[in-house]
């Protein structure tokens, strides 16, 4: 197969994929089906802290009342 023939086949493949993808975009009416069909429980309706939920399961209770002890810094050049 010559270079001219390979280039022609390449152009045909590109043209065919473009023609196939245009009608599918029109059929979707410009909407993203994956977003529209997402379960409502996967999308949070409000932004809350971890303590806005059940503190025992979502985060340590010390984070809710600011009683967590700070972690000691490790020695090193950046922490001096």
Curated annotation (Swiss-Prot):
Q: Which residues are glycosylated?
A: 45
Question: In which tissues has expression of this protein been reported?
Answer: Expressed by the venom duct.
UniProt keyword annotations, A-Z: Amidation, Disulfide bond, Glycoprotein, Hydroxylation, Ion channel impairing toxin, Neurotoxin, Pyrrolidone carboxylic acid, Secreted, Signal, Toxin, Voltage-gated sodium channel impairing toxin
MF annotations from Gene Ontology: acetylcholine receptor inhibitor activity; sodium channel regulator activity; toxin activity
| Entry protein name | Conotoxin SmIVA
The similarity comment for this entry is: Belongs to the conotoxin A superfamily.
Residue ranges annotated as propeptide are: 22-38, 76-80
Q: Which residues form a coiled coil?
A: none
As stated in the Swiss-Prot or TrEMBL entry, residues carrying the post-translational modification 4-hydroxyproline are: 55, 60, 70, 72
User: Which top-level group of life is the source organism from?
Assistant: Eukaryota
Q: Which GO terms describe its cellular component?
A: extracellular region
Native organism: Conus stercusmuscarum (Fly-specked cone)
